[in-house]
């Protein structure tokens, strides 16, 4: 009893031309880079507690992007990752721009007040004679 594999007669003529015509290989090209989920950036944006909870929205979309990437749906993962990136950028802008504007207002206000104080000091240092009161 012969149980060896393959169970073909090695002396039989092979039809390589028929096999080559029956099988076709399709090359789709190299897959693109894996989508980014921006998870770490979203976690830090969430921890900073910025305006309108944009960091939390970024974290939600980052988790969805990671889930879709693990499921193999790369296009949905790219879309969720892109939304997470946009929310992170908005959160960073809402976090950085108002304090910078406030700092600019304080500096310009201080400069303006120092100029007013300088002008008013000259006014109060004026000495009047007794003849001026008559």
Curated annotation (Swiss-Prot):
Its main location: membrane. Keywords: Cell membrane, Developmental protein, Lipoprotein, Membrane, Mineral balance, Palmitate, Transmembrane, Transmembrane helix. GO terms for biological process: bone mineralization; bone morphogenesis; in utero embryonic development; regulation of bone mineralization; response to rapamycin; response to tacrolimus; skeletal system development. The keyword Membrane applies. Residues 1-31 are annotated as: Disordered. Residues 1-39, 110-134 are extracellular. The chain crosses the membrane at residues 40-60, 89-109. It is found in: Cell membrane. A lipid is attached at residues 52-53, 86 (S-palmitoyl cysteine). Residues 1-20 have a biased composition (Basic and acidic residues). Disruption phenotype: Embryonic lethality, leading to the birth of only 7% homozygous mutant pups, instead of the expected 25%. Only two out of eight pups were female. Crossing homozygous mice gave rise to about one sixth of the normal litter size, and many newborns died within 48 hours after birth. Homozygous newborns display no striking phenotype other than smaller bones and especially shorter long bones, and this phenotype persists into adulthood. The radius, ulna and tibia are frequently bent in newborns, but this is no longer the case in young adults. It is a multi-pass membrane protein. One of its GO terms (cellular component) is cytosol. The keyword RNA-binding does not apply. Palmitoylated. Induction: By interferons. Detected in embryonic bone (at protein level). Highly expressed in osteoblasts of adults and embryos. Expressed in primitive hemopoietic cells. It holds the Pfam family CD225. Residues 61-88 are cytoplasmic. Belongs to the CD225/Dispanin family. Membrane topology is controversial. The N-terminus is cytoplasmic and the C-terminus extracellular according to PubMed:24715519, while both the N-terminus and the C-terminus are extracellular according to PubMed:18442316. Required for normal bone mineralization. Interacts with FKBP11. This is Interferon-induced transmembrane protein 5. It comes from Mus musculus.
């Amino acid at each position: 009893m012969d149980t060896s594999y393959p169970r073909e007669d090695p002396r039989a003529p092979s039809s390589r031309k028929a096999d080559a015509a029956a099988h076709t290989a399709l090359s789709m090209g190299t897959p693109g880079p894996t989508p980014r989920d921006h998870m770490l950036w979203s976690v830090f944006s969430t921890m900073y507690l910025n305006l309108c909870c944009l960091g939390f929205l970024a974290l939600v979309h980052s988790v969805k992007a990671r889930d879709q990437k693990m499921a193999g749906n790369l296009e949905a993962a790219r879309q969720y990752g892109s939304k997470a990136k946009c929310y992170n950028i908005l959160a960073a802008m809402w976090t950085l721009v108002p304090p910078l504007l406030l700092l600019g207002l304080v500096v310009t206000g201080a400069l303006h007040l120092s100029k007013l104080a300088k002008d008013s000091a000259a006014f109060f240092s004026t000495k009047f004679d007794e003849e001026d009161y008559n």
